[in-house]
Regions:
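Short, composition-biased local secondary-structure segments
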Residues: 7-17, 80-86, 128-131
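Rossmann-fold dinucleotide-binding core
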Residues: 11, 31-103
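Residue-level detector of anion-binding/catalytic polar loops
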Residues: 1-2, 45, 84, 122, ...
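Helical "substrate-binding/catalytic lid" subdomain
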Residues: 94-184
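Rossmann-like NAD(P)-binding element
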Residues: 1-34
Length: 184
């Protein structure tokens, strides 16, 4: 089995590099369902995957969503590990819709902070959040920490999410903008 976990922009190139591999190719990248279909064309035994959660340091914290014809064999390799395999109809679609919220809202908070800073009301916004939406100051702090380390990768993920929204006939502008927030 080849397990591909790389930044979204490299997923197709990695699949091309190993085209013709006869084993299971498990793509667990943050890619759109359309990109997953494109990658499947290069692999005979393709499994679409999507990871939700942080590093699997302990059981129950990280899921590996799987879809495709070879999911049983792929799931068996992770059974009993800290990475919980879960078979779903479309792993990439689930990953995209989950990350649209979890990482998309991080981009929104960062942009809101920057707009408030621009207009000189950052402190006042933080004070209002502390009063009326008590979870947001810590969520913003978490977004600031995460984007410093992972923003470059999340930008590509937002592009993939935007493509997913467009394919579903939904507006894609928010996540295209979120990609720009992560690029700056």
């Amino acid at each position: 089995m080849i397990l591909s976990i790389c930044p979204p922009h490299a997923a197709l190139d990695v699949a091309r590099e190993v085209a013709g591999f006869n084993g299971i190719y498990l793509d667990a990248n943050a890619i759109s369902p359309m990109r997953a279909q494109e990658i499947a064309e290069f692999q005979q035994r393709y499994v679409d995957g999507g990871i939700v959660g942080g590093p699997p340091d302990e059981p129950g914290t990280t899921r590996l969503y799987l879809s495709g014809d070879e999911t049983s064999e792929a799931a068996a390799l992770f059974a009993g590990s800290n990475l919980e395999p879960v078979v779903v109809p479309d792993a990439s679609a689930l990953k995209m819709t989950y990350a649209a919220w979890s990482k998309g809202t991080a981009a929104m908070l960062l942009a809101l902070r920057d707009v408030a800073r621009h207009f000189g009301v950052e402190r006042e916004l933080a004070a209002e959040w502390a009063r009326s939406m008590t979870y947001l100051p810590e969520r913003l702090a978490g977004a600031e920490r995460s984007v410093a380390a992972k923003g470059w990768r999340w930008a590509g993920e937002m592009d993939e999410i935007a493509d997913t929204f467009a394919a579903a006939g939904e507006p894609d502008g928010f996540h295209r903008a979120a990609a720009e927030v992560f690029r700056t």
